[in-house]
A protein has these predicted regions:
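Iron-sulfur-associated redox domains of electron-transfer enzymes in respiratory
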Residues: 1-183
Length: 183
């Protein structure tokens, strides 16, 4: 019997959720026995090579490129899981949502204390190669259908492990309080 296929990606986030996944420590060897990875920074596969059973999404959508990646994951994954606060609610990147995008860019490139004296030409990046910023940061479920949510910033490794094993084995998730609590 073939192993379930898992894909992962990081959108507008810090990669902390992937680090938490790697924090399952030696259980990563057990995970490799349970699943194969496809399109993931974990195995450096950059494009889907087949349909996947489970997709783990970290980060929200703040660029048009994030939306395209998320839609591609929805198309290629039977089950899609939002992992972490950025994917679920927009997280820290969503702090810009109450500020018009132009003001955010001006603060970052023209007025901020770290750039005020270093950008005397008042240049703001504007190149067709750069991804287009969205008007706000969108949580994943506002863009595509999400099947499961794993909260935390980042979620604990035990939470990710328990949820992933339950999904792979087609079992009900047993997620006791301890896997949500972070000391």
């Amino acid at each position: 019997m073939s192993k379930p296929i898992v894909a992962t990606t990081s959108l507008a986030g810090c990669f902390g959720c992937h680090m938490s996944l790697l924090d399952i420590d030696e259980r990563i060897l057990d995970l490799i026995e349970l699943v194969d990875f496809n399109k993931s920074p974990i195995d450096d596969i950059k494009n889907f090579t087949q349909q996947c059973d489970i997709g783990l999404i970290e980060g929200g959508c703040c660029l048009d490129e994030n939306v395209h990646v998320l839609e591609d994951f929805r198309k290629h994954c039977k089950i899609l899981v939002s992992v972490g606060e950025c994917a679920i609610m927009g997280g820290l990147p969503a702090m810009r949502n109450g500020i018009p995008i132009r003001e955010c860019l001006e603060e970052a490139y023209l007025k901020g204390p770290t750039v005020r004296n270093s950008n005397e030409e008042k240049i703001m990046p504007n190149d067709e190669e750069l991804p287009i910023m969205l008007d706000r940061v969108y949580p994943c479920h506002e863009v595509v259908k999400i099947d499961y949510f794993l909260p935390g910033c980042p979620p604990r490794a035990d939470l990710i492990w328990n949820a992933l094993v339950a999904l792979v084995k087609n079992e009900e998730m047993d997620l006791p309080y301890e896997v949500f609590k972070f000391d």
